[in-house]
Amino acid sequence: MTKTKIIFMGTPQFAATVLKGLIDSNQYEILAVVTQPDRKVGRKQELRMTPVKELALTVNLPVLQPEKLSGSVEMTQIMTLLESGEVGIVTAAFGQFLPGKLLDVAQFAVNTHASLLPKYRGGAPIHYAIMNGEKEAGVTIMEMIRKMDAGDMIAQDSTPILEDDNVGTMFEKLALVGRDLLLETLPKYLSGQLKAQAQNEDEVTFSPNISPEEEKIDWNKSAREIFNKVRGMNPFPVAHTTWNGERFKIYETKVVDDSVGNLQAGEIVEKTKKSLKVATGEGLLELLFVQPAGKPKMDIVSFLNGLGQKIQVGDKFGD
């Protein structure tokens, strides 16, 4: 059987799961893997490879890491590979816009996008689906065109978003959905069995990358909205407020259905040895996992036994 030649482009674990599926299927000859450059991460600022690069190196695939594709040496290398004939591009959460001339030369170009298009075009579809309280999320296999995430759709599959899901758990679930959907549908698409369908432009919504401003918790929102925001940013970039003038990250919360009464949003209304409840614009929110400035992530009991001993009912989170 002749293997389909492809160049794979992707960056996070979501993309690594898709790449592993392509490798294991033994149907594809992967000429190169393109991923983001190594980045410094964490408090120690250690240089870290992307999950896609880590996987590619374990199976001796050539890795290209352009800071930006346009005008790069790597772009020239990719063009040379594409011009060698009958080579396609497969992407999954690559994190860069593909120059049009790559799309022009590639035999085909398909993207594994983590949303039920036309909803949530852009770089943070899973975050927004959770933050907006959606009951399901999904993956779309789509043709790539010059406009972001606007190409015709080849296939779609969905999975429920449960109450205890967050960005991390949904990334894991959707990576498997995306992997299986791509492996099932790409051969049918390339053979002409599957025809791509246009997106309904009237139903388009966007999910741009999360800005630092959006990471801040607005305590005037309802407890449910803040609950969704917190899990829609856990484990990254992490929602935060301020306490004692310093950043205070919140990883996990629980909506408490008590009537709030005449309390100020952000005010601490109940403190025990094991729990901390905060007033919001509507309802109470119980904090479960937090991270004070300069400290590791901890459960609320650990916080209350340490730094949190200072916190009092009537104190306020936020500016």
Curated annotation (Swiss-Prot):
Protein residues bound to (6S)-5,6,7,8-tetrahydrofolate: 115-118
InterPro entries membership: Fmt, Formyl_trans_C, Formyl_trans_C_sf, Formyl_transf_N, Formyl_transf_N_sf, Formyl_transferase-like_C_sf, Met-tRNA-FMT_C, Met-tRNA-FMT_N
Keywords associated with the record: Protein biosynthesis, Transferase
EC numbers on record: 2.1.2.9
One GO MF term attached to the UniProt entry: methionyl-tRNA formyltransferase activity
Enzyme class, broadest EC rank: transferase
GO terms for cellular component: cytosol
Reaction it catalyzes: L-methionyl-tRNA(fMet) + (6R)-10-formyltetrahydrofolate = N-formyl-L-methionyl-tRNA(fMet) + (6S)-5,6,7,8-tetrahydrofolate + H(+)
HAMAP family, per the entry: Formyl_trans
Function: Attaches a formyl group to the free amino group of methionyl-tRNA(fMet). The formyl group appears to play a dual role in the initiator identity of N-formylmethionyl-tRNA by promoting its recognition by IF2 and preventing the misappropriation of this tRNA by the elongation apparatus.
Family label: Belongs to the Fmt family.
The protein's name in its UniProt record: Methionyl-tRNA formyltransferase
Originating species: Lactococcus lactis subsp. lactis (strain IL1403)
